[in-house]
Amino acid sequence: MSAPPWSCPLPVEEGLTEEGLLKIRRGTVLRRPGRLTPLRAVAHLAAWLPFILGPARLIQHGWRPVGDEAAIALRSWSELTAHGPMVGQATRLAHGVFDPGPLEYWLLAIPVHLDTVHGVLWGAVICCLVACSLAVEAAWSVLGAAGGLCASGLIVGLMVWMPDIAITPSWNPWFGMAFFIAALAAAWAVVSGHRGWWPVLVITASIADQAHLMFTVPSAALAILALIVGLVDTIRGRPGYWWVVTGLIAGAACWSAPVIEQFTSRDGNLGLLLHSSGGAGTGRQTGGAFSLKALSAAVGPVPIWWKSQQSSAIYQLISHRPAGLAVAVLILVAVAAVMAVRPLRCRPLGALALVSLVISLGALVTYSSIPVHNTSLLTLGYLIVLLFPVGVLSWLVVGTWAVLTARLIVSRAAARSAAAQRRGLPADDGEGPAGQALRGAGPLAGLGAAALIAVGAILAVALQGPTVHRVTADPAMAASVAASRQIARALPGQPIALSIHDFDASALGRMTLGVAWALTPDGFRAEIMRARLARELGTRYVFRGGAIPRVKVRVRPHGTSIAVTRPTQLASHR
């Protein structure tokens, strides 16, 4: 199959050969030549650069997994044991439940066994690099170099706006975001007629979905939309259902653990998630008005992602946005999708408009379901990451639709004028000075876009400095290392009851999880005496009063100390 063009063609006359669900002829302008291979390399390398240098700087500054990263490392370690988790991380978007599945743990299980200190970080880096390349290649399959550079630019722009994603990609929201971008590109490819990308869409959407609950609705909707379009394409004369079978097998493998857990547990996690999606057990939620305002913040004239992230005031900024703007933009995107069928006859635009519309509606569902009881919206500031692809795709769709519509109007007006003035003269073959200039401008535009993306990647790396310093300055890192070393010297590997005292309350949980993980490779299993924190790791880590050593860690300004109470000592005090 020949490579797709860079641009959409003008409408074709009746009787000409047309292809695909939308009956749109492929363009013949600026096909992808071999000399554009360097652009492909730039697209990949620019997307990779922040993910490589950010974690490398973390490791150089003495990073250790604490908090959620420690929990992810510990649960990934358990995947190669008889007690592997079958659900994801504990989520704040519902009470007492977990993210849908353990795919992130499956992917990081081998790295954390190979390197117990940094494996969770560099393992996540490798996974995110693969996700970035999948996004670039999927977009490249649609529009050649233009598509690949757009995908790379989307990734780089996201890294500029939110540097944390590339610095700590092991954190499950950031891990899921990388694969959500890949799912967007794969969905665009499938809806554009490249059905072979549907299995990739199923896998990447499943990883994003299971990594964090905020991706669940958009990811599932993308997979279903692409399946429907692909099936219609197949029925309309493109035989072969191998892509459906492959995708379904991949989906069954990805969702085997959550489904098994659902039917073998008394309270299955998937059932609890469905139950809580209607607000049951979560109390008051943000609601539809807030979700429309959030979407307005993403697509407005001065979008929220246009400025540097200010998570401390993010929800105040959203609450002042007009809800009607989101409705207007959704209507424009829907109009663009319809006009892409006729009169524009541009399938890539129609596909992108459908993808944009689906993730926008999915984001509305997500942002309307954020619980506001027993939590602060400020603690969930990372959820705004979903606004970036929503806003950028909406802008891209509306802008492209406006340009192609203007081009169509001008071309039709010029055709009528030329027909009136030169009636009876031979038709122009379209290869006049204007057509030659257009062909010559294509490579220059590609080089300019590649240079701009490369500069953006360098800027993204330059903006990582403050975040690297903030992350590595966490006092829980040094304290957890000191405490775990003292415990390992005092006791052989065994189950222990762990408690942390005299430490900063805001970092107490992060240190506790950091110590629990640091001890695990040495044969310890820390049963945490803070039940709520322990349940985030699983029931095996909840202290139930057994006859095991109790380890009390005290963190004071002059140093860290431990006190061990053995079972015999406990019995003598009774």
Question: Predicted regions span which residues?
Answer:
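Loop-to-helix entry region of an early transmembrane alpha helix in multi-pass inner-membrane enzymes
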Residues: L45, P102-W106, H113-S133, A166-N172, ...
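Extracytosolic helix-loop segments that constitute the early lumenal/periplasmic catalytic or substrate-binding loops
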Residues: G54-A56, A71-W106, I110
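Transmembrane-lumen/periplasm boundary regions of multi-pass, lipid-linked membrane glycan transferases
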Residues: R75-S78, D233-T234, W242-V329
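Transmembrane-helix motifs of polytopic, lipid-linked glycan transferases
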Residues: W122-G144, A182, M339-A340
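Transmembrane-helix signature of polytopic, membrane-embedded enzymes
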Residues: A135-V160
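Membrane-interface transmembrane helices that cradle and orient dolichyl/undecaprenyl
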Residues: A183-W198, A208, T234-R236
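Membrane-interface alpha helices of multi-pass inner-membrane proteins
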Residues: W198-F215, S219-I224, A250-A253
